[in-house]
Amino acid sequence: PEGLDAVIVLNSFGSLLWGEQGLASIDVPVLSIGGSMDLITPPLNEQLRPFQQLQHPNSRLAVVEGGSHFSAVGMRRDQALMRLGSDLVGEDPRLVQQALVELHVRFLDSLYEGGSAPRGIQSVAGVRTYVLDGEMAEPLQP
């Protein structure tokens, strides 16, 4: 759409939402973020294939180590979901939430400044994060 400068998707059901054409028609930078422990929308199955269809050189796929589908949800430790354990809620949801905010900011700042969006293995808020561009993601198979 006109006036749209970037898109950020988090734990996206890529195969369900985007269909066969995926994100191919989006001509702005996209930051797609998934968690390495996400059992609901596993990054390789749900984010990689749609990401590989993107054409913009500043699009990025970020995988947050220890992040789950629920890591992004702000919850108190005494809530029932948090008692399910790290297999479902991730290693440390608060750190992952900080990392998500920082990933958003880094991505948008790079676009605002007219530079290239960050890529590579990064420590974001103390969390290891793998940020891939199209070239890095190309040889990967879901």
Question: Each predicted region: which residue ranges?
Answer:
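Proteins with a high burden of low-complexity, intrinsically disordered sequence enriched in S/T/G/P/A and R
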Residues: 1, 36, 43, 122-124, ...
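Primarily recognizes the serine-hydrolase "nucleophile elbow" in alpha/beta-hydrolase
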Residues: 1-20
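Generic structural signal for short, flexible, solvent-exposed coil/loop and linker residues
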Residues: 2, 19, 50-51, 119-121
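Divalent metal-coordination and catalytic microenvironments
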Residues: 7, 61, 108
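Active-site-adjacent alpha-helix of alpha/beta-hydrolase-fold enzymes
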Residues: 25-97
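Alpha/beta-hydrolase-fold serine-hydrolase catalytic core, especially in secreted/extracellular enzymes
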Residues: 67-68, 75-142
